[in-house]
Curated annotation (Swiss-Prot):
One record GO biological process: translation
Species of provenance: Halorhodospira halophila (strain DSM 244 / SL1) (Ectothiorhodospira halophila (strain DSM 244 / SL1))
UniProt family annotation: Belongs to the universal ribosomal protein uL30 family.
Subunit structure, interactors included: Part of the 50S ribosomal subunit.
Pfam families: Ribosomal_L30
SUPFAM superfamilies per UniProt: Ribosomal protein L30p/L7e (SSF55129)
InterPro entries: Ribo_uL30_ferredoxin-like_sf (IPR036919), Ribosomal_uL30_bac-type (IPR005996), Ribosomal_uL30_ferredoxin-like (IPR016082)
Gene Ontology CC: cytosolic large ribosomal subunit
Protein's UniProt name: Large ribosomal subunit protein uL30
Key words, A-Z: Ribonucleoprotein, Ribosomal protein
MF terms in GO: structural constituent of ribosome
């Protein structure tokens, strides 16, 4: 699986005051702080979490 596609995900908006499930999705993607960027595998599970909190994220293909 070394050739699996990756997504570069950056947290652009704060999780304060958001729904608990949305905060859990952000945490599940490995994001802790604003403006932090992580690389995640392009899987249906990660795509679902990204879609749920897309208003807080910036996503690019890596």
């Amino acid at each position: 699986m070394a050739n699996q596609k990756k997504l570069q995900v950056t947290l652009r908006r704060s999780v304060h005051g958001r729904l608990q499930k949305h905060r859990q999705c952000v945490r599940g993607l490995g994001l802790r702080r604003m403006h932090q960027t992580v690389l995640v595998d392009d899987t249906p599970e990660n795509r679902g979490m990204i879609r749920k909190v897309s208003y807080m994220l910036e996503v690019q293909e890596a």
